[in-house]
């Protein structure tokens, strides 16, 4: 049977690092990029006698996440010890939640190819992150353990196996990432590992009612890797089934260099971790008043914001979706629109620049909107220069890039680079006459019906004027002199 005769079934476990200043059970910093083991203390090092103390901000962020995703917030939840041995886990167990998580149920709605899909959630629970093993590839082959990340607070968001393709899994994760960023609980930085996911993948013949044996693919930190890993794993399982071989339930790792998954270890079940209630922490009691306060503080979520952009500003679903994918970008867009002007036409102009040239420049520099030298007011100034005919499209692009990189004022860039358009009819007419005189054959063909030659003439005039002619005036004069 070909792959098309099988249905892939996917559930995701998303680990999101919470944007707290300190760790979940101690006061150590959660800052990324410090010297190895600089942000540690007896608690996160797992030293004897050190006792954990729960960070209240972690609970509030978990509740905030659960409310945004439509979960039931449990009034009482319990931490548990998840027992396993690994060099980056200093205590020999991870403090997580098992039987009584803080949030249950909920769902994530996402759009794929113009259709809405919904994936149900099983639960959201709080837990601490592990450390990081660092392997030296030099001759001595030494390995070290960096425990800066140990104890960093996470929420794990577990979906039901409702996803039916790699594309659905990617769009689900994009939608969830946008929600977490809009809530201010996660920065969405997959490269640094503050948002990563495991995928549980199985296949079954279409029409079958029983799910196949699942394999878990660990720690994917990009949308591209997630898609590649699921597609490879689905093919691998189908090939095993077609060959009459069993699919072994196991944990696998995705190798991005080879584009394939490979076996890590046999898949653990809950009993393998010997969960039991954490004796050093009391139950977490979440009062109804706290839940209602947090509910009242929830921001506009990405899906609602995108719908507002489409309904009130006339933006396309594509443009609106691109803007709300990052809450900081959407806020920057709102500020730029406020500085430039209201209405669908203004919104479209601003959106085009934000999702186009500014997105390209930000991708090159890796800068978040808060660090952009191109402010909303400066973009509005560029657009007003275009509206006034001072600069054209190509000139505006040069101005935007220069302002983005240097923070110079747009009008100063126009003067310094000599980008101002020539709108004087006399100057443009002289260039038009020169071009027509140099191309009498093409002019005759145009008058004979070859109207597509207008672009040729416009290009020649702009070349003659070193790109500074006002295109509207150039077009009008050419049409008049060519007899249109």
Curated annotation (Swiss-Prot):
It catalyses: L-glutamyl-tRNA(Gln) + L-glutamine + ATP + H2O = L-glutaminyl-tRNA(Gln) + L-glutamate + ADP + phosphate + H(+); L-aspartyl-tRNA(Asn) + L-glutamine + ATP + H2O = L-asparaginyl-tRNA(Asn) + L-glutamate + ADP + phosphate + 2 H(+). SMART domains: GatB_Yqey (SM00845). Heterotrimer of A, B and C subunits. Allows the formation of correctly charged Asn-tRNA(Asn) or Gln-tRNA(Gln) through the transamidation of misacylated Asp-tRNA(Asn) or Glu-tRNA(Gln) in organisms which lack either or both of asparaginyl-tRNA or glutaminyl-tRNA synthetases. The reaction takes place in the presence of glutamine and ATP through an activated phospho-Asp-tRNA(Asn) or phospho-Glu-tRNA(Gln). It comes from Anaeromyxobacter dehalogenans (strain 2CP-1 / ATCC BAA-258). Pfam families: GatB_N (PF02934), GatB_Yqey (PF02637). InterPro entries: Asn/Gln-tRNA_amidoTrfase_suB/E, Asn/Gln-tRNA_Trfase_suB/E_cat, Asn/Gln_amidotransferase, Asn/Gln_tRNA_amidoTrase-B-like, GatB, GatB_C_1, GatB_Yqey_C_2, Gln-tRNA_amidoTrfase_suB_CS. This is Aspartyl/glutamyl-tRNA(Asn/Gln) amidotransferase subunit B. Signal peptide: none annotated. Belongs to the GatB/GatE family. GatB subfamily. Keywords: ATP-binding, Ligase, Nucleotide-binding, Protein biosynthesis. Its EC number is 6.3.5.-. The gene is gatB. It comes from the Bacteria. GO terms for molecular function: asparaginyl-tRNA synthase (glutamine-hydrolyzing) activity; ATP binding; glutaminyl-tRNA synthase (glutamine-hydrolyzing) activity. The keyword Metal-binding does not apply. SUPFAM superfamilies: GatB/YqeY motif, Glutamine synthetase/guanido kinase. PROSITE patterns: GATB.
């Amino acid at each position: 049977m070909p792959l098309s005769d099988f249905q892939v079934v996917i559930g995701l476990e998303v680990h999101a690092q919470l944007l707290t200043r300190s760790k979940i059970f101690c006061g150590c910093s959660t800052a990324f990029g410090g010297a190895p083991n600089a942000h540690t203390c007896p608690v996160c090092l797992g030293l004897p006698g050190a006792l954990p103390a729960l960070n209240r901000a972690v609970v509030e962020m978990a509740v905030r996440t659960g409310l945004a995703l439509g979960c039931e917030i449990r009034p009482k939840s319990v931490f548990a010890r998840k027992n396993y041995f690994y060099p980056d886990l200093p205590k020999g167990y991870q403090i997580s939640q098992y039987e009584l998580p803080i949030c249950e149920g909920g769902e994530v709605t996402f759009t794929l190819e113009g259709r809405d899909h919904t994936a149900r959630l099983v639960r959201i629970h709080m837990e601490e992150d592990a450390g990081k093993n660092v392997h030296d590839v030099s001759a001595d082959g030494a390995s070290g353990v960096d425990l800066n990340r140990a104890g960093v607070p996470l929420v794990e968001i577990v979906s039901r196996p409702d996803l039916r393709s790699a594309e659905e899994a990617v769009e689900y994760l994009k939608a969830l990432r946008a929600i977490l960023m809009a809530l201010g609980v996660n920065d969405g930085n997959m490269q640094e590992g503050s948002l990563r996911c495991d995928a549980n993948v199985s296949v079954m013949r279409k029409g079958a009612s029983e799910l196949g044996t699942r394999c878990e693919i660990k720690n994917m930190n990009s949308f591209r890797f997630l898609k590649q890993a699921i597609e490879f794993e689905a093919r691998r399982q189908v090939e095993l089934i077609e060959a009459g071989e069993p699919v072994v339930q196991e944990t696998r790792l995705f190798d991005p260099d080879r584009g394939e998954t490979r076996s890590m270890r046999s898949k653990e079940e809950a009993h393998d971790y010997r969960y039991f209630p954490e004796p050093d922490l009391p139950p977490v009691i979440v009062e109804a008043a706290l839940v209602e306060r947090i509910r009242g503080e929830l921001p506009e979520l990405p899906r609602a914001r995108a719908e507002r952009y489409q309904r009130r500003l006339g933006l396309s679903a594509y443009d609106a979706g691109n803007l709300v994918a990052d809450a900081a970008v959407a806020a920057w867009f709102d500020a730029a629109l406020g500085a430039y002007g209201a209405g669908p036409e203004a919104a479209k102009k601003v959106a085009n620049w934000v999702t186009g040239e500014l997105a390209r420049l930000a991708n090159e520099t890796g800068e978040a909107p808060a660090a952009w030298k191109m402010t909303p007011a400066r973009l509005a100034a560029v657009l007003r220069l275009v509206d006034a005919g001072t600069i054209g499209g190509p000139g505006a692009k040069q101005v935007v890039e220069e302002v983005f990189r240097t923070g110079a004022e747009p009008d100063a860039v126009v003067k310094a680079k000599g980008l101002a358009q020539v709108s004087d009819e006399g100057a443009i007419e002289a260039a038009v006459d020169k071009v027509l005189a140099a191309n009498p054959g093409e002019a005759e063909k145009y008058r004979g019906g070859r109207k597509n030659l207008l672009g040729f003439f416009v290009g020649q005039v702009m070349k003659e004027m070193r790109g500074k002619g006002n295109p509207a005036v150039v077009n009008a004069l050419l049409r008049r002199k060519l007899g249109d």
